[in-house]
């Protein structure tokens, strides 16, 4: 399994932490154009499964000497022993709408918090994690270059709309995007819920049942 560790710091104090879970692994998603990749910002980062990654991320911040700013790291959990192995460590914000996912996981604003961390060291908002927020990135299918129809969305919104705060898809008539060059592909959606299982259930429906078609 592959994850992120993200943090905002001010004067050596950690103001906010996040762990996102990539579903499926990024390499698998890159090799299969029919997949709708997901990134889930988890509400509970104290879970035993991800604790080694959080611990190593905190140690990496100390080694880097990062006192103030935002950090984004990517790591995977070994299938053999559960060890956390880091593949990327950066003193930067994440891409791929992940910061927006963090916002939706706590009803806060990490962009504002980042600015406050640099300017004053104090936060004016609650950044308590309340929700699991799953980002789903869609890719059009079919032989054509132009979006001809979008299927399955209305039904899911009718049934689960309160737990789908973001729907930002291409419109019918637009040219499909090159998903190999754009992380968000032909648009993105968000499913969120306090319960992780419920979040994953809605996210899977958005990934599997919503289809963006280019009929040619």
Tell where the protein language model's regions lie, with residue ranges.
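Peripheral (often C-terminal) accessory segments that flank ATP-dependent C-N-forming ligase machineries
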Residues: 115-216
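ATP-dependent carboxylate/phosphate-activation module, predominantly the ATP-grasp catalytic core
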Residues: 2-66, 70, 77-80, 86, ...
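Active-site proximal loops enriched in glycine and acidic residues that flank catalytic Cys/His/Asp
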Residues: 75, 88-91, 140, 193
């Amino acid at each position: 399994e592959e994850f992120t560790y993200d943090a905002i710091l001010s004067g050596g104090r950690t103001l906010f932490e996040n762990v996102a879970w990539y579903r499926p692994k990024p390499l698998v998603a890159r090799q299969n154009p029919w997949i709708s990749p997901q990134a889930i910002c988890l509400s509970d980062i104290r879970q035993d499964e991800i604790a080694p990654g959080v611990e190593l991320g905190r140690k990496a911040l100390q080694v880097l000497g990062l006192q103030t700013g935002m950090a984004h790291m990517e790591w995977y959990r070994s299938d053999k022993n559960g060890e956390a192995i880091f593949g990327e460590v950066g003193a930067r914000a994440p891409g791929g709408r992940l910061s927006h996912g963090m916002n939706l996981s706590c009803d806060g604003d990490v962009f504002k918090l980042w600015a406050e961390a640099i300017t004053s060291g104090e936060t004016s908002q609650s950044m308590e994690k309340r929700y699991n927020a799953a980002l789903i990135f869609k890719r059009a299918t079919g032989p054509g270059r132009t979006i001809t129809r979008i299927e399955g969305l209305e039904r899911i919104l009718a049934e689960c709309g309160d737990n789908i705060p973001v729907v930002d898809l291409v419109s019918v008539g637009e040219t499909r995007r090159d998903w190999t060059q754009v992380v968000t592909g032909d648009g993105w959606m968000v499913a969120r819920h306090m319960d992780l299982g419920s979040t994953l259930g809605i996210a899977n429906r958005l990934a599997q049942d919503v289809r963006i078609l280019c009929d040619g």
